[in-house]
Amino acid sequence: APMFPNVILVGLGNTLFYTVTSFVVGLLGGIVLALMRLSSFGPYRWLATAYVEFFRGVPALLVFLAFGYGVPFAFGVSWPIPVVVMVALGMVSAAYIAETLRAGLQAVPRGQMEAARSLGMPTWRAMVTIVIPQAFRIVLPPLTNEVILLTKDSSLVYVLGLAAHEYELTKFGRDGISALDAGMTPILVAGLFYLVITVPLSLLARRFEARSTKKGH
């Protein structure tokens, strides 16, 4: 069996990798969806709304199964596990991030955009340089919480059947009980490592929230 420290470090590294890559996909998709939701062009709004409602309403586990087994079976393609995780978690995350960003964009006073437009600045430039940066400051706490949720949801990758080098923390904890003959230790260690990731993120979210509240007064 693999050595205990090596396996847990692989699991930790993979969990962080799955979380970060899926968050990047979710953030990019969320920005596009949020702008579509706020668009004056009806079809964009309807398409984005349908996407958001679908992926917020379907369990992430089903999305994993769809991209891990359904799509490869239907189209005869085979994706590496990291790609499946990045796409599946990223698409689910994009739906939640889109709603968070939409709320943040709507919280920026309209006068900011109107002032920029009155100075002759194009709408897209005003959005990129003035509105979106302010919106991001508003939504930093919920975005940090989204990273925490992604960290925990990355554990769903176990349903895809992993090679040892693809293990994340939960898979390590689950298989380690029997493979390493170490009792409950693998589960406890996996839980501890999750806390090492999520507790600092939670504290960071609170700090962002406190700073945002202070600036609001």
Question: Where are the regions a protein language model picked out?
Answer:
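Transmembrane alpha-helices and adjacent helix-loop boundaries
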Residues: 1-217
